[in-house]
A protein has these predicted regions:
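Short coil/turn linkers that connect adjacent helices within long alpha-helical scaffolds
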Residues: 3-11, 50-57, 95-99, 137-141, ...
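Hydrophobic positions within repeat-based interaction scaffolds
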Residues: 141, 147, 154-185
């Protein structure tokens, strides 16, 4: 692949090369080789940044690919690599979008999930409530992102022995879940 990574590469070649490294990253992840997955993803984004003058770094596909990897790393309980990728994701969102965008809300949601996995209830609450606010302002409350946020807040408060809040977020989760199901009919 590296023979295509040169000073004469055009936008299409650079984009394809970046996508190849992203796919390699996903392959490593499926093989449960988290360090190699993170390294390949970093290479994919380094290529995008190297050719940023063509707008490759600003591609929303890049953000979606990063978030998919973060989610997979979290499912694999590879929190350290998830934090590395999330840091890059957050930097791109803040540089090219804003701290009120849906993408930043998703960033706060992911950070809240990481905080929960690390047993840090106070930062988890702060990040999940931030996600609830940002996502709600960006796209409303009737969507899967908000449903996920409510589910994690319910779980957090149940673990943290705050039953009133846990019940409130359970009810919000069930309300959004039913609304989303109704939209599918």
């Amino acid at each position: 692949m590296e023979k295509f990574h040169n000073k004469d590469a055009d936008m299409r070649t650079a984009n394809l090369l970046s996508n190849l490294y992203n796919n390699l990253s996903n392959t490593y992840l499926l093989m449960k080789r988290g360090n190699e997955a993170a390294k390949a993803l970093r290479t994919a984004f380094d290529i995008r940044m190297e050719y940023a003058h063509w707008g490759l770094a600003e591609s929303h596909d890049s953000l979606q690919q990063m978030m998919n990897l973060i989610n997979m790393l979290l499912l694999a309980k590879d929190v350290d690599n998830a934090k590395i990728v999330l840091e890059q994701y957050e930097s791109l969102v803040l540089e090219h979008l804003s701290d009120t965008s849906l993408d930043y809300g998703i960033c706060k949601l992911s950070q809240g999930i990481i905080d929960m996995m690390e047993g840090k209830p106070e930062p988890a609450e702060m990040n999940l409530l931030g996600a609830e606010n940002i996502i709600g302002n960006a796209v409303g409350s009737d969507n899967d992102y908000m449903k996920t946020t409510y589910r994690y807040l319910n779980n957090l408060y149940a673990r943290w022995k705050k039953p009133e809040k846990a019940i409130a977020y359970r009810d919000k989760f069930l309300g959004v879940k039913q609304s989303v199901l109704n939209q599918l009919e």
